[in-house]
């Protein structure tokens, strides 16, 4: 939104969190420090922010190059680098004390007990919610290695719910035969919402040398190219689940956000597009608001899942 302009609709409730608008920073490099999270909230206008994924032990991630820009988006294989939950507590506390928006901690582990350990270990910093990363496609033993197994997803979700009293979101991988099976497992485990989608498996090769471009060879594709995948996944999950679906994948404009919301997203996360402009959240919020006014919708809830009424 233009400087000084605020979302004029009522505060937006999502799993009990009060958001100033339905846009959220997706987990990624801008969530690495408390200062960067605050910048996105204050300068960018995000309704909430999600941290970089944090695990049980320090992790350096994959060798460079670990991220490249493509015509259609980004390809990355970061490998979940992080300082561990004890090493991140101070950053999370800073974000909580200075961002003025809900702060969601993204966490990962290789087993239910590790997820529970990290979740419980971050509680002193008082995150507003937790997002379980069971969907990263380029970290062996973590992420999608967990998130492609419905039984394990249910167990991980239940283990975290047992040790926290804040909302738990589960971020799903699109790299499965049927994402609704994974969504149902998360819901059965007690998830308060699911987030769809994480990156799509991808690869790039330097044709002059024949070498894969990424240090890890393959990685995850994000950006505009994955939006149709995200729309379909959100649409299917909205039909299959009773809990909210948070849409993410390829959102770079208010039109993209509205499309995901019509597919069933209760809110939208933005990741890759933030690399071009941090104030994209304000732009998207203003665009959604203008769209609602132009179409005569008195409540943003009127467009959530609207496409399901058209068939």
Swiss-Prot record:
Q: Which SUPFAM superfamilies match?
A: FMN-linked oxidoreductases (SSF51395)
Q: Which Pfam families match?
A: DHO_dh
Reaction catalysed by this enzyme: (S)-dihydroorotate + NAD(+) = orotate + NADH + H(+)
Where does it mainly reside?
Answer: cytoplasm
Q: Where does substrate bind?
A: 52, 76-80, 133, 198-199
The answer to whether the entry has keyword Oxidoreductase is yes
One GO term (biological process): 'de novo' UMP biosynthetic process
Q: Name one GO molecular function term.
A: dihydroorotate dehydrogenase (NAD+) activity
The record's comment on cofactor binding reads: Binds 1 FMN per subunit.
Leading EC class: oxidoreductase
Q: Which PANTHER family match?
A: DIHYDROOROTATE DEHYDROGENASE (FUMARATE), DIHYDROOROTATE DEHYDROGENASE (QUINONE), MITOCHONDRIAL-RELATED
Q: What does this protein do?
A: Catalyzes the conversion of dihydroorotate to orotate with NAD(+) as electron acceptor.
The identity of this protein, by name, is Dihydroorotate dehydrogenase B (NAD(+)), catalytic subunit
Write down the species: Methanosarcina acetivorans (strain ATCC 35395 / DSM 2834 / JCM 12185 / C2A)
């Amino acid at each position: 939104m233009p400087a000084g302009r605020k979302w004029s609709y009522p505060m937006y409730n999502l799993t009990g969190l009060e958001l100033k608008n339905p846009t959220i920073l997706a987990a990624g490099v801008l969530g690495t420090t408390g200062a960067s999270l605050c910048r996105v909230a204050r300068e960018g206008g995000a309704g909430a922010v999600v941290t970089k994924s944090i695990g049980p032990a320090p992790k350096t991630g994959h060798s460079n190059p670990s991220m490249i820009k493509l015509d259609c988006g980004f390809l990355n294989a970061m490998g979940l680098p992080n300082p561990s939950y004890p090493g991140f507590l101070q950053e999370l506390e800073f974000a909580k004390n200075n961002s003025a928006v809900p702060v969601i901690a993204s966490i990962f582990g290789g087993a239910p007990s590790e997820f529970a350990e990290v979740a419980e270990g971050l509680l002193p910093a008082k995150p507003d919610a937790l997002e379980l990363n069971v969907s990263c496609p380029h970290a062996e033993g973590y992420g999608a290695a967990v998130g492609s197994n419905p039984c394990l997803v249910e167990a991980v979700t239940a283990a975290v719910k047992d040790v926290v009293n804040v909302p738990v979101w589960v971020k799903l991988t699109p790299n499965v035969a049927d994402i609704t099976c994974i969504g149902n497992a998360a819901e059965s485990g007690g998830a308060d919402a699911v987030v769809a989608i994480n990156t799509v498996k991808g690869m790039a090769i330097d044709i002059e040398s024949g070498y894969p471009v990424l240090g890890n060879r393959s990685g995850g594709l994000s950006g505009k190219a994955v939006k149709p995948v995200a729309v379909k996944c959100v649409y299917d999950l909205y039909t299959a689940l009773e809990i909210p679906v948070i849409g993410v994948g390829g959102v770079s404009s208010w039109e993209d956000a509205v499309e995901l919301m019509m597919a069933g997203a209760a809110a939208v996360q933005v990741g890759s597009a933030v690399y071009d402009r941090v104030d994209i959240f304000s732009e998207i919020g203003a665009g959604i608001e203008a769209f609602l006014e132009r179409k005569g919708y008195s409540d943003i809830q009127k467009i959530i899942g609207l496409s399901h009424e058209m068939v």
